[in-house]
Amino acid sequence: MRTCRASAAGKFTVVLATIVVVLTGCGGNPSPRAWAATVCGALTPWRSEIDKLTSSTDEQMTAQTTPAQAKENLVRLFGGAEQASETARRKVEQAGVPETDNGEVISAGFRGSLEKMRDAYGRARDTIDKLSTSEPTAFYAGVRAAVETLNKEYDASALDTSQLNSEELKQAFDEVPECR
């Protein structure tokens, strides 16, 4: 009896292991097309949100509002940009690593760029939140300085495409509908 049970348990383990391998695939990594579609699906709404927030920020800089109103609105806007960047970063992270040469480096590059953008928006929000609104000239000078710093940090966080030398991914980004 023991031999029969041990044999059955061994067979069950082999069958279970086979099912796990079949269901997860060899590496479990998405194809370049699937990864590109997921990444573009994450970045398209993020870009739209950032564009909208940028326009709103520009309006706040020229609107006839009190410093307190401008501060409240800018803190909210930059907080929204920070959250949108984190949401996009999380979705790119959930996309996994594309099944291509340098897939890990490429995925890490996208995530790292979004992390830096998220952090830049967070720092701008925190800087503006700490500004006093009692003196309008000083407040708006502080806002301008915070936005200049944000722009520099944002530019510095741009993805280094020199590491993205995967022809499969380039083709996938050109072809999948989510990236158009």
Residue positions per predicted region:
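Immediate post-signal-peptide N-terminus of mature secreted/exported proteins
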Residues: 28-79, 175-179
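Short, solvent-exposed, charged loop/turn and helix-capping segments
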Residues: 86-111, 123-135
